[in-house]
């Protein structure tokens, strides 16, 4: 299960200050600050069977290492995103010709098999960004704080990525939410109601409501 807060960071000065925030520096796990180059391609059938069943499938390279990910269901409320998530490290051969069969045996496989019905998959959109992230420990929760800058790319237009994510790793969910709200208030951030995938779908003209 993925549990994260998402905020839009529209001001460059705010982006710079978040990364050097005094409170984050105090609770950051030493050596956890890192920069990750991310390049994601989302796939679906020609009929968007996965989207229509509130399932997202992507292959994302993180500093060159491809990872296949499924996300499904969940809810979004006041910038808090909760959904099912499954990640599998894959090789380059798989990344060039991805298949849902790699998730066979998982809790979601029967559902995705029923949704896609062995139809071929095609690239739908891309989300490319540079992520700067750190792991923080408040004593009550451990979270990953990430700042993403980049672009969503579709055949019908592009959109910028400039967002802050605070994702719960372990511990108390309310404590993680309090940390995220503290940062949002301090830097005047807007709640992010839409995932990168959802923004891309809307660029493509996809109208059906879902929580992806």
Language-model region placement:
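Phosphate-end processing signature that detects enzymes handling 5′-triphosphorylated RNA
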Residues: 1-212
């Amino acid at each position: 299960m993925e549990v994260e807060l998402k905020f839009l960071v529209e001001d460059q000065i705010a982006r710079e200050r978040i990364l050097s925030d005094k409170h984050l520096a105090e609770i950051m796990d030493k050596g956890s600050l890192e920069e990750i180059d991310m390049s994601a391609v989302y796939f679906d059938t020609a009929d968007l069977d996965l989207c229509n069943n509130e399932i997202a499938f992507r292959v994302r390279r993180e500093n060159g290492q491809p990872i296949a990910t499924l996300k499904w269901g969940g809810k979004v409320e006041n910038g808090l995103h909760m959904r099912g998530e499954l990640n599998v490290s894959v090789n380059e051969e798989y990344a060039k010709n991805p298949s849902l069969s790699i998730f066979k045996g998982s809790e979601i496989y029967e559902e995705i098999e029923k949704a896609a019905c062995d139809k071929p998959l095609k690239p739908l959109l891309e989300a490319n960004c540079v992520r700067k992230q750190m792991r923080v420990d408040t004593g009550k929760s451990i979270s990953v704080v990430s700042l993403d800058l980049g672009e969503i790319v579709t055949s019908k237009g592009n959109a910028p990525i400039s967002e802050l994510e605070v994702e719960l790793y372990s511990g108390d969910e309310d404590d993680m939410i309090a940390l995220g709200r503290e940062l949002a208030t301090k830097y005047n951030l807007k709640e992010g109601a839409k995932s990168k995938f959802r923004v891309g779908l809307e660029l493509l003209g996809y109208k059906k409501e879902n929580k992806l």
